[in-house]
Structures are given as structure tokens and as C-alpha cells.
Design a protein with these regions (language model features):
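Hydrophobic alpha-helical segments
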Residues: 17, 23-231
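Positively charged n-region of N-terminal signal peptides that target proteins for export
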Residues: 1-3
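Bacterial N-terminal signal peptides
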Residues: 5-15
């Protein structure tokens, strides 16, 4: 069991390197073993065990292999959403494909893509999602001041119009469960109809992921510092 866990940690670190995620934080300290909740499997760091590849059907094997594919790097390896989807590959395979399209093929500036993800993670208080994407957002050029507005739930002031529109839209969508006409009109003015649909789909995709992470109590990788403060 211990050897499997070490392999998974190593593979997830390699995946983060392949994705261009900064490794400064992990490299600056020696990981320490933490005590997991009693219902958490150490090899998956969630409430679900990590299936062996040979026990999966053909679709499950495709999902498994895609996680290890260097052409499709994940931020978390098997100790994250991908590990959860191995238990339902019929749902997981198309969901992961939609995530890939939204992240890589939809024409949205990378910093705004990551901002939309972070707004979603903050509104769902998803520690795993936030901690995975904060370094990516900064790498993609998101202003740290904008990041802090989302992180600490500050009022939006003196922010660029695109960032302001996304933050207001996401907060109303998830916090208020409705979007005011004037907020929608501003999104439409700034981005146009197609982009508003794509941004909404991106946020919905990560809201779905946040729910899955919460249900199965996905823990951070061993030695990973949580980056999202809880009120």
C-alpha cells in the first residue's frame, strides 16, 4: 500500500510539472505524513479506493491511461477528480473530455479561465480545487490583487472590466442562485453571447467537480499546503 501511494504521489508531481504548474512550494519543504480521516483510503486520499487497472472495463482502462498520458496532463493525477471518475468511467470519460475542451479549446484568455475556476472554487469553498488552481492562475498572469479579491471575498473595486464582470457573475450565480439582468447585460457587453455560454459552462464544470470532491472528501496531496482560508 505504501509503495502504491509513493508511486501515485510521484506521478501526480510529474503531471503537475508537465502542466507547467510551479513546483516552488513543494520543493521548498520536505513533505510530512499527515493523519487522514478514518474513512479515507491513503492511496487515493479520498473515500473511494483506487481501482487496479486490470479490474477496470475497457472504458475504465481508457480513463486510467489518459491520466498517465503526458499529452493530457492533470493537476492531481489519481489523487483527485480523475481517481473518483475511475469508479464511473461512463460518466467520467465524457466529463473529462468536456473539461479538456473548456480548458484548452475554448477561446478564453488563460488568466480569465483560471479566474472563472477560482471564483467557482471560492463560492463552493473547495480547498482542493482552489489549491490546485491558484498557482496556475498566477502563472497565467492573473493579478495577485484580483486573486485576493476572490480569495478573501472582497468588494470589487478598480479591477479591469473583464475580471469585474466574471467575479460579479460567478458570485451571483452560485451565491444568490440567480443573475441580475444588469449583471448579465454587462457580461454580454464585455464578452458576447458565445463567450458567456462558454464561461458559464466552465464554471458549471468546476462546480460539478467541487461537488464530487466534497462528497468523497478528497484530501490534498501529502505535504501540500492549503491555500484557501475558510471563514
Amino acid at each position: 500500500m505504501r509503495s502504491i501511494g509513493l508511486v501515485l504521489i510521484a506521478s501526480s508531481a510529474l503531471a503537475r510539472c508537465a502542466a507547467g504548474v510551479p513546483q516552488r512550494e513543494e520543493a521548498s519543504k520536505v513533505p510530512t505524513m499527515t493523519t487522514l480521516p478514518k474513512d479515507i483510503y491513503p492511496e487515493s486520499r479520498s473515500r473511494l479506493p483506487l481501482p487496479k487497472r486490470e479490474a477496470l472495463d475497457e472504458q475504465g482502462k481508457r480513463v486510467y491511461d489518459s491520466v498517465l498520458d503526458p499529452k493530457r496532463p492533470t493537476l492531481a493525477g489519481f489523487q483527485g477528480p480523475a481517481g473518483i471518475w475511475l469508479h464511473s468511467p461512463r460518466v467520467g470519460e465524457p466529463f473529462r473530455e468536456m473539461n479538456r475542451i473548456l480548458r484548452n479549446e475554448v477561446p478564453l484568455e488563460p488568466r480569465l479561465r483560471e479566474l472563472a475556476i477560482l471564483v467557482t472554487a471560492r463560492e463552493f469553498d473547495s480547498q482542493f480545487e482552489w489549491t490546485a488552481h491558484e498557482p496556475v492562475a498566477l502563472k497565467e498572469g492573473l493579478d495577485p490583487k484580483i486573486l485576493d479579491i476572490v480569495k478573501f471575498r472582497k468588494a470589487v473595486s478598480e479591477a479591469p472590466e473583464k475580471e469585474t464582470a466574471i467575479i460579479a457573475f460567478g458570485r451571483e450565480l452560485f451565491r444568490d442562485r440567480k443573475v441580475r439582468p444588469e449583471t448579465y447585460a454587462e457580461m454580454l457587453r464585455v464578452f458576447g453571447q458565445t463567450a458567456v455560454v462558454n464561461i458559464t459552462a466552465l464554471m458549471a464544470n468546476y462546480a460539478f467537480t467541487a461537488v464530487m470532491l466534497t462528497a468523497f472528501d478528497q484530501q490534498l496531496h501529502e505535504g501540500r499546503k492549503p491555500l484557501l482560508p475558510f471563514p
